[in-house]
Every structure is written in structure tokens, then in C-alpha cells.
């Protein structure tokens, strides 16, 4: 009797287990079919990121926009709102090389001019202002205006980079040669400023020498 009861319990458990498996399979199939039907009725739309175009500012448009073409040269507006000729990358690099060569020549002239500074220098006591060893260097600075030496004066790089002659470009009073006149005017303004600064420096040096002479005279009287 006991064995029959055990066998019947096992059979009932197996039947229950099989029924549960069947229910799970049916529920899974139903859910899959519902998902497929829903996807067929409502297709999923792909979301693409918005294509944001970079808008050029008016300043950029003004730089790249050609103003006019004169004598084979296309003129554009620079960042500083000056009319300048448009050059290719190779032309710009060539003119940059010329400007670098100009700078190298100026510096080599400066070095050659002052390379013997130790021999012609004066020894000055910074506390008292007294010239301990007088080699005439300070006196020559006041007597000679060294800034007028054009070999050691660097000119504007604008002409070196652009390098278009006035004859090739047309009349100097032409609208499209304002960059050349502006550069010449700026150079003259710089020269005028340099002259005023040189006059101020000379006055300061003269005042310092007067003070120094007064100190020396006092010391001589004391001694």
C-alpha cells in the first residue's frame, strides 16, 4: 500500500510539473506575439542628432570677401579693417622669410655695433653715482644720437609681407593703396614719437650730469 501511494504522489508531481511548464511556454509565446504585433503596428522611428551648421559671423565674411580686383591683384578687408591684397599661402610664406631675414640683419648689426661693449664701457658706483673708471662711454651717449643709425632700426614688417610696388598698384592716391599710405604715415608718426622721446632722454641725462657734477664739486670742496 505504501509503495502505491508513493508512486501515485510522484506521478501527480510529474503531471503538475509538466502542466506548469506548459503554462509557462504558452504565456511566453503569447507575450512574444503581442510584442511582434505592437512592433508591426507602431514601427520604431530612429532618432538622428540634429545637424548644426556653423554660422559664419559678419567679421569672417568680411575677411574672406574680396573687395575689388585692380591690376591683377584681388583686394580683401583685413582684421584691422584695412584694404590689403589677397596672397596665396606660398606668397605669404615667402614674404615672411623676407621679414625674418630683415629682422636677422637688424639684430646682427646691433650685435656688431655693441659687441665690444666691455672695452668702451664705464665703471659706475651705483650707490653714489660716481664714475669710477671713465672710458668716455657715457659722454659719447650724450654727444652722439645712436638711435639715428638706420642699420639698427627695424622697419615695419607690413611692407615686407605685402611687397607690392606703387607703380604696379597704380596711383598713390588710389583707394586701394591706402594700406601703403597708412604704413608711411604710421612710420612718420613713430619717427616723431622717437624724436620726442630722444629729447626727453637727453634732458634727463643732462639733469643727471648736472646733479653728478654738483656732487663732485661738493666732494672736491670737502677734500
From Swiss-Prot:
Coiled coil: none annotated. Signal peptide: none annotated. This is Protein SCM3. The keyword Nucleus applies. The lineage of its organism: Eukaryota, Fungi, Dikarya, Ascomycota, Saccharomycotina. One of its GO terms (molecular function) is CENP-A containing nucleosome binding. Present with 556 molecules/cell in log phase SD medium. Residues 1-48, 168-202 are annotated as: Disordered. The keyword DNA repair does not apply. InterPro entries: Scm3/HJURP. Residues 1-14 have a biased composition (Basic residues). Residues 23-40 have a biased composition (Basic and acidic residues). Gene3D superfamilies: 6.10.250.2010. Interacts with YTA7. GO terms for biological process: chromosome segregation; G2/M transition of mitotic cell cycle; kinetochore assembly; negative regulation of ubiquitin-dependent protein catabolic process; protein localization to chromosome, centromeric region. Keywords: Nucleus. GO terms for cellular component: condensed chromosome, centromeric region; cytoplasm; nucleus. It is found in: Nucleus. Centromeric protein that plays a central role in the incorporation and maintenance of histone H3-like variant CENPA at centromeres. Residues 184-200 have a biased composition (Acidic residues).
